[in-house]
Design a protein with these regions (language model features):
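Ankyrin repeat domain, specifically the short helix-to-loop turn at the C-terminus of the second helix
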Residues: 25-33, 59-65, 105-112, 133-141, ...
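Conserved ankyrin/ankyrin-like repeat signature
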Residues: 19, 23, 55-56, 103, ...
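Ankyrin-repeat intra-repeat helix-capping/turn positions
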Residues: 17-19, 52, 99, 127, ...
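Start-of-repeat signature of ankyrin repeats
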Residues: 6, 41, 75, 88, ...
Length: 606
C-alpha cells in the first residue's frame, strides 16, 4: 500500500522523527518492499540517508556506501544497530574541517543548497579557502544570510586581510560583491588592522570591477575615498574619483579626503585630489581648510599645492585647457603646478592656443620663460595660424620676442596670407622689434601672397601713423637692411604709393607731416615717381585724392608729372576738384598776383 505521493510503509517509517532499526526490520520481514520509489524518484534508503540514519541505511541496502566518519569509527563492531544517527550536513562539516574529502560528494548530494550555503558562515570553514571552493563547486548557495543578515561575501569583507583567500575563492566562482557598503567593510577592516598591502588594493579594485558599491560610507560614517586615503591606495583613489564619488564627502570626523591627505602628509594623494577637483577651500568641522592644516603641521611643500591665489581651481577635474587659461592670467606658479600634475605643457584650449601662445600674447615673460624651460614648443600654431612669436609681436612684447627667438622660434614661419612676423612688426610700426628680427636674420625681401614685402607693410603703417620719429626709424631700419624701395607688389603698388594711401579709402584720416617725412626718406633713396597702381593713380593722384597740399608741392618739386592721367583719363588736379580740395587743385597752376585760389578756381570753372 502507498499514499498519495507513492510512499509505502518503509519509506514513511524512514521519514519519521523517531524510528528504530527493529521497526524497519519488522516491516521488511512483512515483505514491505524497500526498493520502491515515491513520486519524486526517491527510495527508502535515500530518505534514511538524508536523515543521517546510517543503521537503517545499512539495513535497507548493505551495499550503500557509508561516510568514512561512520564506517571507520564502527567498522569492527558487529551488527548494524550500533551505527550512529548523524546528519549528512554534520558529517560534511567535519570532513571539510579536517580535510577528509572521501565520500563528501555523496554527502553533499544529500544536502540542500541552502544547507551547504550555511556552511559558508561556519566559524571553522568560512576562512578556509579550500573548503569554500569545495562547497561552491558542489552547489552551495552563496546568498544564504547569517544571524546578522549578511551574505558570506559581506561577512568575509568585514574580516579584512584574514579573509582574502576565501574572498578570492568566492570571486572565482562568480559571487557578486554588489550591495551597499561592501567595499567600505573591507577598507574599514584594513584600516583597523593597519593592513595596506598592494595585494589588498588590487583586491579592492577587483571588487569594484565586479560591482562593489563605491559610494556608501562605512557603518562609522567614513566614505570609501577617505578610507582609501588613510590606506594610501592611490590606484583605488583614482578609480573612485574617476567614477564620480563625492570629492568633498566628510568622514566621521568632519574632514574631507583632502584634509586627510594633508594631515597624513600623503603628497601623492593630495596631488591626485587637487587634479580631480577637490577644493582646498573646504572647511572641516573645526573650520580649518586643507591649506591651514598644511601650515599648522609645518608642511610648506604641501601648502604650495593648496595655495591658488591668482588662477583659482575650477572645482572640477582639471583639463588640458586649464594650462592655457592659467597662462593667460600670468600665474607662473599655477602653470608650474598644472604641468607637475601631468597636464601637457603644449596643451591647447578651444581656439587651439597653447599656454606659451597665451602667455606671449599677454606679456607674461615669467610664464613664457618657465614654459620654455619645461620644453614648450615655440612653433605650435593656433587654429587661426597665430604662433607664440606672432602673438608677442602683435602685443609689442620685445623681451618675449627675444626669448622666443633664443628658444628657436622659426622667424620665417608663414602666417595666414603668407605673412611673416617681420611684415607684421612693420605693419604695426614697431622699429625696435623689426631691428631685433632683422638681427636674427629675418628676410627683408620676403613677400606675402600679395607680393607685399616688409617695406610695403611699413608704408601701409606710415599713411595712418602719428609718430614721425617711429616711422622714420622703421623706414631707416628696413632700408639699411637692404629693402628694395622700388619693388612693386601685387596691383603694381610701390612703397611710395602705399605711403601715399594707395590702399586707403578716400577720407581716411592721416597726419600730413608724418607722411611727408616718410616720403622725404623714400625720395632720398631716389625712388621713381613714374609709378601707378591698377587705377592708374600715380603719386600726385594719391596726394590729391587724400587732400594733401604739402605733399603735392613736394612731389611737384621732385619732378612728378602733373599731367599724368589715370585709367579714367583724369589728371591729379581733376581728382582734387572732384574731391572738393580747392586748395590742393590750386597747387597745380602757377600763382597769379592778387588772385586767390578760390577766385582762380571759380574763373576757370566758367
Amino acid at each position: 500500500a502507498i499514499d498519495g505521493e507513492g510512499r509505502n510503509a518503509v519509506m514513511l517509517a524512514c521519514a519519521a522523527d523517531n524510528v528504530s532499526p527493529a521497526l524497519i526490520r519488522r516491516l521488511l520481514d512483512l515483505q514491505v518492499p524497500a526498493d520502491s520509489v515515491d513520486a519524486h524518484g526517491r527510495r527508502a534508503v535515500d530518505v534514511a540517508a538524508e536523515a543521517g540514519r546510517w543503521a537503517i541505511v545499512q539495513l535497507l541496502d548493505p551495499a550503500y556506501p557509508l561516510p568514512a566518519a561512520v564506517s571507520d569509527g564502527h567498522g569492527d563492531t558487529p551488527g548494524v544497530a550500533v551505527l550512529p544517527d548523524r546528519p549528512p550536513l554534520v558529517l560534511l562539516r567535519e570532513g571539510l574541517q579536517f580535510g577528509q574529502r572521501d565520500g563528501l560528494v555523496a554527502l553533499a548530494r544529500l544536502c540542500a543548497p541552502e544547507e551547504l550555503g550555511g556552511l559558508l558562515h561556519d566559524a571553522h570553514l568560512a576562512l578556509n579557502a579550500e573548503a569554500v571552493d569545495w562547497l561552491l563547486r558542489h552547489g552551495a548557495d552563496a546568498d544564504v544570510r547569517d544571524a546578522c543578515g549578511d551574505v558570506p561575501m559581506f561577512a568575509l569583507l568585514s574580516r579584512g586581510v584574514e579573509a582574502v583567500p576565501a574572498l578570492q575563492a568566492l570571486l572565482r566562482h562568480g559571487v557578486s560583491p554588489a550591495g551597499a557598503g561592501g567595499l567600505t567593510r573591507l577598507l574599514s577592516a584594513c584600516v583597523q588592522h593597519d593592513a595596506a598591502s598592494r595585494g589588498l588594493e588590487q583586491l579592492a579594485l577587483e571588487l569594484l570591477e565586479r560591482g562593489a558599491d563605491p559610494f556608501a560610507p562605512s557603518a562609522a560614517g567614513d566614505p570609501p575615498l577617505s578610507l582609501a586615503v588613510r590606506l594610501g591606495w592611490l590606484r583605488l583613489q583614482q578609480w573612485l574619483l574617476e567614477h564620480g564619488v563625492d570629492r568633498e564627502a566628510r568622514d566621521s570626523h568632519g574632514m574631507t579626503a583632502l584634509h586627510l591627505a594633508t594631515a597624513l602628509g600623503r603628497d601623492a594623494s593630495l596631488k591626485l585630489l587637487v587634479k580631480q577637483g577637490a577644493s582646498p577651500e573646504a572647511r572641516a568641522a573645526d573650520g580649518q581648510t586643507p591649506l591651514g592644516v598644511a601650515l599648522s603641521i609645518g608642511r610648506r611643500d604641501l601648502a604650495d599645492w593648496l595655495d591658488w591665489r591668482i588662477w583659482s581651481l575650477p572645482r572640477r577635474t582639471l583639463r588640458e585647457a586649464d594650462v592655457p587659461a592659467a597662462a593667460m592670467t600670468g600665474d607662473t606658479d599655477a602653470v608650474r603646478r598644472l604641468i607637475d600634475l601631468g597636464l601637457p605643457v603644449d596643451a591647447v584650449d578651444a581656439q587651439g592656443c597653447t599656454a606659451l601662445l597665451r602667455a606671449a600674447g599677454g606679456g607674461h615673460l615669467g610664464v613664457v620663460a618657465h614654459l620654455l624651460n619645461r620644453g614648450a614648443d615655440p612653433q605650435r600654431a593656433a587654429n587661426s595660424g597665430a604662433t607664440p612669436l606672432s602673438a608677442a609681436v602683435s602685443m609689442r612684447q620685445t623681451e618675449i620676442v627675444a626669448a622666443l627667438l633664443q628658444a628657436g622660434a622659426q622667424i620665417e614661419h608663414r602666417l595666414p596670407g603668407g605673412v611673416t612676423v617681420l611684415m607684421l612688426a612693420c605693419a604695426l610700426g614697431l622699429p625696435d622689434i623689426v631691428a631685433r628680427l632683422l638681427t636674427a636674420a629675418a628676410d627683408v625681401h620676403a613677400t606675402d601672397n600679395q607680393e607685399l614685402a616688409p617695406l610695403h607693410c611699413a608704408a601701409l603703417y606710415g599713411f595712418t601713423a602719428r609718430d614721425k620719429n617711429r616711422l622714420l626709424a622703421l623706414l631707416d631700419t628696413l632700408l639699411l637692411a637692404g629693402a628694395d624701395p622700388e619693388h612693386l607688389a601685387g596691383g603694381r603698388v610701390s612703397p611710395l604709393l602705399l605711403l601715399l594711401g594707395a590702399r586707403a579709402e578716400p577720407g581716411t584720416a592721416c597726419d600730413e607731416q608724418v607722411v611727408l617725412a616718410g616720403v622725404e626718406r623714400l625720395l632720398d633713396e631716389e625712388v621713381s615717381l613714374d609709378v601707378a597702381d591698377q587705377r592708374g593713380f600715380g603719386p600726385l593722384h594719391l596726394a590729391a585724392l587724400h587732400g594733401l597740399p604739402l605733399l603735392v608741392q613736394r612731389l611737384l618739386r621732385a619732378g612728378a608729372d602733373a599731367d599724368r592721367r589715370d585709367a579714367l583719363n583724369r589728371t591729379p588736379r581733376e581728382i582734387a576738384i572732384m574731391r572738393g580740395f580747392i586748395d590742393v587743385a590750386g597747387q597745380f597752376e602757377p600763382a597769379l598776383p592778387g588772385v586767390s585760389l578760390m577766385a582762380r578756381f571759380l574763373r576757370e570753372g566758367r
